[in-house]
Amino acid sequence: MTRLQLASCSAALATLVLAGAGTTARAQDAVHEHRCTGQWRVTNDERITSCTVLIDSGRYQAPNLAILHHDRGIALRAKGDLAGALTDFAEAVRLDPDFARAFADRGSLRLAQHDLDNAIADLDTAIRLDANDAGAFMTRGNAYDEKTDFDRSIADYNEAIRLSPTYGAAFFNRGLAFRRKGDFDHAITDYDQAIKLDPKNASALNNRGVVWFEKGDFDRAIADYNQALRVDGNFAPAYNNRGEAWRAKGDTARALADFDRAIQLSPQFALAFDNRGLVHYQKRDYDRAIADFDAAVRFDPGNAAAYGNRGNAHDDKGDRNAAVADYNEAIRLDPKNARHFYDRGIALRRDGDFDRAIADLSEALRLNPQFAGAYNERGYAFYQKHDFARAIPDYDEAIKLNPKFAIAYNNRGNAFDDKGEPDRAIADYNEALRADPSYAAALYNRGIAWRHKGDLDRAVADYDQAIKLNPTAAAYNNRGSAWLAKGEPERAIADLDQAIKLDPRSADAYINRGNAKRERQAFADANADYTHAIELSPNAALAYYNRAWAHYLAGENVEALADADRAIALNERSASAYSTRGLVRERLADNAGAIADFRKALEIDPSFRQPAEGLQRLKAAPAAGSR
C-alpha cells in the first residue's frame, strides 16, 4: 500500500541589512534568495547554485545562513543527494539550534534512510521548539509506525489532526497504523475521512479496499478498487489488489486479467507476479506458476513469501529438491515465519524423510504454538512411521485448536482404525463429515472401518457416497472388494473395471478383479489379472498368493507350488500362503511338507481353520505353542 510522504517546506529568509553592500550586489543577492528559498519556480540545480553563491559570499550570518543551508538541503534531497542534504541540515541546526524546521526536515530525511531512532530524536526537538507543527507530529508518527510502535504513531497522528483538522494525509496514515494494529473498523473510519477530504484520493480508496478485503468483505473491497481505478486508471496497486479479491471469490479469470494489467502497467511489480503465480498454482498450472514466482524473486530478492510459493509449486510438481531449496531460502530470509518450516516439513514428509519433517514441524510449532495445521502434519508424519502413540496426541491438539478441522478428524480416524479400534475411527470420521459433509475421503475411510467391523452394507453405502462426491479408482476398488465379500462377483467386476479404467496402474484393482473372476471359476482370466498385477508390482506377495490359489483350484499344482513359494519368499508372515502351499503339497502326497506348512500357518494365525483341518486330515498335531 502507498504511504503519503510529508512535503517539506522551505524557510523564508529574514529581511537583511548588509553593511557596505552595493546596490548591484544586493539586487543579485535578491535574485539568488528568491531562487534558493523556492519563491521562484526553478530547477533543483538552479536552486542549489543560488544557495551555494549566497553561502559562499560570506555576507550572511546566522540565523539567515542556517536558512540557506536548510534550503540547499531541501534541493539536494529532491535530487537524491541524501548525504549532501544531511550535511546541510546538520550545518543549519548547528548555526541555529532553535531552527525547528531544520530539525523536522532532518528527521524526515533520517526516516527515509530508516535511521529511526535519530529521526525521532530530531522530531522530538522540532516539536519541543514548535509544538504547533502538525507536519512534525505527522512525520514522527510515521517513524513510530515503521518501528511498529502503533500506539505512539496513532498518538502523533491524533495530535497532527488536532492541530490541522483537514490534514488528509494524517487521517490516511492513521488509517494505515490502525490497519497494521488489526483495528480494521477505526482504519475504515480514517480512510472515510481522508476520502471525504479528497474524493479523488486513489490511494485512500485502494487502502480502504484492502481493509474491507482483510475483513472478508470482498464485494466492498472490489467496489473501492473500482472507484480508485475510476480516479486513476493506471493505478497498478489497485489492479493487483482487485485481482486478489477476485481470486478470493474464486473468479480466476478476472483475477488473472487484473494481475496481467497490473504487470503491464508496472513490469517489475513483484507482488503482482507473486499473486498471478498463486492463481496459476491453484489451477495446477505449475510451469506458469513457477515462471511468475521466478519473476517475483528476480524483482524482489528479499520476498520470502515468493520463495515459499515457488517451493510449493515445485513440491506439488514432484521436484522435492527444488522445493526444499526454495524453502531453505524462505527460511533464511524470514527465519521466524512458522509457515516456511511447515511447508518444508511437508516436502520432507512426502519424500519419506520423516525425522527431518518432524523436526521442521516441531520448529513451526515452537514459532507458532497455535498452528493447528502443523500439529496435523506432524501427526501424519508420526502416523507414516507407524508411531500411533505420538500421532494421535498431535491430532488431538490440532482438533483442540480447531474443533472443525475435518482433515485432523479424518487422520485421527485412520490412526485409530490402523490400531484396530474401528469404533473410535468411525466416531472421528463422523465428526469429519459433520464439519465437512462433502468430504469424500472421510466417507471412503469410514467405509474401510465398517468393512473391518464386518458391516459390508454400511461399507458399500459409504463407498456409494464417496463415489458420488469424488469417483476415484480407490473408492471403486474398495466397493468392488466389498461386493465380492458380499458374494456378488458381477457387481464387483463392474466396479473393478471402472477402478482400472481410472487407474490402469493399480495392482490392487487387478488383484481384486482376479479374485472376483476366480469366484466365477474363470481361472484363466483371473490368472491374467494376477499376472498383470505382478507386472505392475513385482514384489506384490498378495498377487502371487492369489494366483497360487487360482492355480490350485484349477488343478495346476506345479504352477500353484511355484507361486506359493514366491509369495512366502516375499512375505514370510503370510499364513494364507503357507496354508495354500500345504494344500498343494498334500495333493502331491508330500505329507511331511504339507504338515510343516500347515503348522507354520497356524503358528502365524492360530485361528485359521484351513490349516487346522489339513492337520486333522493328515492326523498330525499342531506345532507346540501354536494354540
Descriptions of predicted regions:
Residues V53-D56, Y60, E91-R94, T125-R128, ...:
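Conserved structural position within tetratricopeptide repeats
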Residues P63, P97, A131, P165, ...:
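Short coil turns that delineate tetratricopeptide repeat
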Residues A30-R35, R587, I595-R627:
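Terminal, low-structured helical/coil segments at or just beyond the last alpha-helical repeat
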Residues I67-R77, R101-L111, G135-D145, A169-L176, ...:
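Conserved alpha-helical positions within TPR/SEL1-like repeat arrays
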Residues T23-P63:
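N-terminal leader/linker segments that initiate helical-solenoid repeat arrays
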